[in-house]
Amino acid sequence: MSSRKIIHIDMDAFYASVELREQPHLKGRPVVVAWEGARSVICAASYEARQFGLHSAMSVATAKRLCPQAVYVPPHFDLYRQVSAQIHAVFRRYTDLIEPLSLDEAYLDVTRNFKNIPYASEVAKEIRAAIFAETGLTASAGIAPNKFLAKIASDWRKPNGQFVLPPHKVMAFLETLPLGKIPGVGKVTLKKMQSLGMQTAGDLRRFERGELLNHFGRYGYRLYDLARGTDERPVKAERECLQISTEITLPEDLPLEQAAGHLPHLAEDLWRQITRKNVEAQSVTLKLKTYDFRIITRTLTYSSVLPDCTALLQAAQMLMARVPPQTEDAFRLIGIGVGHLVPKNQQQDLWA
């Protein structure tokens, strides 16, 4: 087992918590972050709203039936990004090995940290305290020898808690871990596992690699390792990139049409980033991740720059239409990105 010390930090109901911080009179009420509209979906739900069964990616229409008294506030992605930058500034006091997963979660490798703190649990405790002191928001943390285990651990004491999974306790922990707790195991995969008599990671571990490959294809390699607590992926430090993108990991696997419901707010979020960076883009890429971790991408490249958010959304919807609607596929992530970036006004806009 690896001797690395990995922390997974996950902010608690991040978007909703930021909105509650800005509008404290809403505290204690079920709050939903979403644009209202017939085809809108929830971006985030407060813990009070979750008690009624509301969750991100649920349609607003369904949410209103389940919880008519919920308060709806539109998302403010620029604000979320500002708060996320504050949180990352806290991370950088301890390590430069930071791998952001989204605005509200990240992996940190603190095996060697700037403050020479020997215990990763103490590093996590300090980080969580600093985040709360500086933003008023709570975070949960998982501490483990690798990224896979740290991500599971961060969910164990939510909200506002942390859980340590040392190497010598990993196998016992996995023995009774429900399969649905394994990141990436969605409804489709879980149903197949259960049909094979599996309920826990311990059950999964009793299958040979060849059997898993037979039942799950290439994903069987990953399942074989995860059942044994093995994950050698390094924490990849953030690097400057030649494109701008945004994506969302869905809380449950969704068919293509429902996943497409996220495109409008993804496009709006991405357009804000483009505007803030003062650049223009000539290509649009759609990214989808299936329940078994296959990546599907589609790209459109234009001879001129995208003029506005509407054009960006239209391009993303055109790309979505190019994805074969295979009924057996369920999707756990959707994202869009832009490339072929140029400084604003450098290239004449030929869309007009």
Swiss-Prot record:
<keyword id="KW-0460">Magnesium</keyword>
<feature type="active site">
    <location>
        <position position="105"/>
    </location>
</feature>
<feature type="binding site">
    <location>
        <position position="10"/>
    </location>
    <ligand>
        <name>Mg(2+)</name>
    </ligand>
</feature>
<dbReference type="InterPro" id="IPR043502">
    <property type="entry name" value="DNA/RNA_pol_sf"/>
</dbReference>
<dbReference type="InterPro" id="IPR043128">
    <property type="entry name" value="Rev_trsase/Diguanyl_cyclase"/>
</dbReference>
<feature type="binding site">
    <location>
        <position position="104"/>
    </location>
    <ligand>
        <name>Mg(2+)</name>
    </ligand>
</feature>
<dbReference type="GO" id="GO:0006261">
    <property type="term" value="P:DNA-templated DNA replication"/>
</dbReference>
<keyword id="KW-0515">Mutator protein</keyword>
<dbReference type="GO" id="GO:0009432">
    <property type="term" value="P:SOS response"/>
</dbReference>
<dbReference type="InterPro" id="IPR050116">
    <property type="entry name" value="DNA_polymerase-Y"/>
</dbReference>
<dbReference type="InterPro" id="IPR022880">
    <property type="entry name" value="DNApol_IV"/>
</dbReference>
<protein>
    <recommendedName>
        <fullName>DNA polymerase IV</fullName>
        <ecNumber>2.7.7.7</ecNumber>
    </recommendedName>
</protein>
<comment type="function">
    <text>Poorly processive, error-prone DNA polymerase involved in untargeted mutagenesis. Copies undamaged DNA at stalled replication forks, which arise in vivo from mismatched or misaligned primer ends. These misaligned primers can be extended by PolIV. Exhibits no 3'-5' exonuclease (proofreading) activity. May be involved in translesional synthesis, in conjunction with the beta clamp from PolIII.</text>
</comment>
<dbReference type="InterPro" id="IPR053848">
    <property type="entry name" value="IMS_HHH_1"/>
</dbReference>
<keyword id="KW-0227">DNA damage</keyword>
<keyword id="KW-0234">DNA repair</keyword>
<dbReference type="GO" id="GO:0042276">
    <property type="term" value="P:error-prone translesion synthesis"/>
</dbReference>
<keyword id="KW-0548">Nucleotidyltransferase</keyword>
<dbReference type="Pfam" id="PF11799">
    <property type="entry name" value="IMS_C"/>
</dbReference>
<keyword id="KW-0239">DNA-directed DNA polymerase</keyword>
<dbReference type="InterPro" id="IPR001126">
    <property type="entry name" value="UmuC"/>
</dbReference>
<feature type="site" description="Substrate discrimination">
    <location>
        <position position="15"/>
    </location>
</feature>
<keyword id="KW-0808">Transferase</keyword>
<keyword id="KW-0235">DNA replication</keyword>
<dbReference type="GO" id="GO:0003887">
    <property type="term" value="F:DNA-directed DNA polymerase activity"/>
</dbReference>
<keyword id="KW-0963">Cytoplasm</keyword>
<comment type="subunit">
    <text>Monomer.</text>
</comment>
<dbReference type="InterPro" id="IPR017961">
    <property type="entry name" value="DNA_pol_Y-fam_little_finger"/>
</dbReference>
<comment type="similarity">
    <text>Belongs to the DNA polymerase type-Y family.</text>
</comment>
<keyword id="KW-0238">DNA-binding</keyword>
<feature type="domain" description="UmuC">
    <location>
        <begin position="6"/>
        <end position="186"/>
    </location>
</feature>
<dbReference type="GO" id="GO:0005829">
    <property type="term" value="C:cytosol"/>
</dbReference>
<dbReference type="InterPro" id="IPR036775">
    <property type="entry name" value="DNA_pol_Y-fam_lit_finger_sf"/>
</dbReference>
<keyword id="KW-0479">Metal-binding</keyword>
<dbReference type="Pfam" id="PF00817">
    <property type="entry name" value="IMS"/>
</dbReference>
<dbReference type="GO" id="GO:0003684">
    <property type="term" value="F:damaged DNA binding"/>
</dbReference>
<dbReference type="GO" id="GO:0000287">
    <property type="term" value="F:magnesium ion binding"/>
</dbReference>
<dbReference type="Pfam" id="PF21999">
    <property type="entry name" value="IMS_HHH_1"/>
</dbReference>
